[in-house]
UniProtKB/Swiss-Prot annotation:
A motif (Microbody targeting signal) lies at residues 692-694. PANTHER family: ACETYL-COENZYME A SYNTHETASE (PTHR24095), ACETYL-COENZYME A SYNTHETASE 1 (PTHR24095:SF14). Its EC number is 6.2.1.1. CoA binds at R229, G230, G231, K232, T348, S563, R631. InterPro entries: Ac_CoA_lig, ACAS_N, AMP-bd_C, AMP-bd_C_sf, AMP-binding_CS, AMP-dep_synth/lig_dom, ANL_N_sf. It holds the Pfam family ACAS_N. This is Acetyl-coenzyme A synthetase 1. It catalyses: acetate + ATP + CoA = acetyl-CoA + AMP + diphosphate.
Amino acid sequence: MVTSAGVGHAEYNNGADVQHADYAHLTSVGQVEQKPLGGRLGALAEYYKPNVASMEEYRAMHAQSITDPAAFYGERARTYVDWFRPFDAVFLPGPDGRPSFDNNAWFVNGQLNACYNLVDRHAARTPDKVAIIYEADEPGEGYSLTYRELLAQVCKVAQVLQYSMGVRKGDTVAVYMPMIPQALVTLLAISRIGAIHSVVFAGFSSNSLRDRINDARSEVVVTTDESKRGGKIIETKRIVDDAIKETPQLRKVLVYKRTCNPSVSYVADRDLDWDTEVKKYKSYCPCEPVDSEHPLFLLYTSGSTGAPKGVQHSTAGYLLQAYLSMLYSFDVHSDDIFFTAGDIGWITGHTYVVYGPLFSGCTTVVFEGTPAYPSYSRYWDIIDKYSVTQFYVAPTALRLLKRAGDSYVDGYSLRTLRSLGTVGEPIAAEVWEWYYTVIGKREIPVIDTYWQTESGAHLVTPLAGGSTPMKPGSASFPFFGIDLAILDPQTGEELLGPNVEGVLAVKQPWPSFTRTIWNNHDRYLDTYLNPYKGYYFAGDGAARDSQGFIWILGRVDDVVNVSGHRLSTAEVEAAIIQESMVAECAVVGFADELTGQAIAAFVVLKQKSSWNTASERELQEIKKHLILSVRRDIGPFAAPKLIVLVDDLPKTRSGKIMRRILRKILAGEADQLGDVSTLSNPGIVKHLIESVKF
């Protein structure tokens, strides 16, 4: 069992402030009454008929997705997915006839190809429709690709991978690229030939990249010479070169020249130039049929034990659930312009920059830059310039833009928007209100989504189009296929009814649920399925209020969420402890106004007396050195915001570090520590409290 650490410290609004978005209001507990659409949505209502029209329809669909998943998913898989060979069964049933975590497989014996469903069929039906709008870091440097052009580029790169680099069906290919169209082309080319892509966020250090390449056993890497972000140059090729010094299986590197910097070094017979290679091949090659359960990609995510986990997703189940979330969560139609301000190095970019939008046949916006460059108006400029219909972004960016001021929004109409999404972390009520009021003009619904790398698509979310009500800060209701439960963290018993708080779990698998951890199925079981037998344990605390709304309360394991990025505290601790001056270290998360959570490291040095007598300047140099160690080992985004040098750490008599005490002190709750007399060193608590200075 896991403990309830972290649960119960978040505030949630139990029953008030239900928002109408000018389309629905709550009349009693659990009941929603519809009223006519108003404002901009009302003007579009006839043209954009909602994919889910009412709360009643949502309830009926959700019930079917849980009680009769064969009918719910079977009908949609036959309707929306193009198959090379039809499936024999929707899922492999467990002993009770329902989907089972013990043998989770969907669309049994079916064959398909992800790239065909994302590109080929649209290139055949709507070849001149824009598939990708590229907004480069520097305004005015972007361009667009139609589905016809995208197909040609994908086929050429697929042949480069096959014939110039020797990639075969089932091989893993590492991808370390910025947010440019060639990154999407690469992912599609890999899936076209039946290989498996393993994208590593291009902000990770060479050490982190090395570890992921080795764990995935990738023999090929695709990267760029450099990348540009926020007006700055990032040396991606140099990072790759450093990483593969310790990847003995690595054979080839494909390099797209983003900046064409002549000083970037290349290794003969290993490094291939993108432009030179694609010229060798024709603009079409056939797709490789793969089984429904064939791995589509690996995506590494932080775990509480420190070593990153290669979360493996299947092809058919992931594609269908990703598309259904586009269809229902965002009410997407095929002529929409979908803008996710996320990176393909994370699951948000996989599902809502690449697979969801392109499967839907709509247009996806690929943004290379940051929300603040060259000004805080950058997002709003993109939305107006390209007539964006759905916008999806992390609360961290919204906090930054809210702080910058409403003047940066002035002058932008944002009139084409039909839904505003948030992703990666819970959104504070005041930020939700700003987003809804200043950006949405109190007419556009805020789709506050909760999901994970492991889930592949949404777990809890409102639905755009008018069917479900909203409440600031709540993720609302379970998505289709999600049989959600809130469990008592100690007993594992389900807490039924309203006004309950515990750990979030799911009772049965859904099509896009991860199948395993690459090369480590035992860890998969221990992390997700063994903590509470019969359930998927999501690792987050949750509450259900009096009206049935779900509130996400944050992690209950040793994972910190910084700007929507999950980081293992153990991984950060390892980066600090490797320094010869460090004896012990404990890393915890604490609340941060901008990033949601930030990282604090409590560090015990080997020479305790030396830092007690050191000058303030010397202490700052020690702290800078430790922060640099984390930046170098993991990446800049993982750098601790606070380093606290201490004489000792709070420990039980068995030697376990009590991180709960550190979290309480950082939260200003030193008066709520409870009985500390059982610590092996209770006197250290006063020292810790006095040492924390923001």
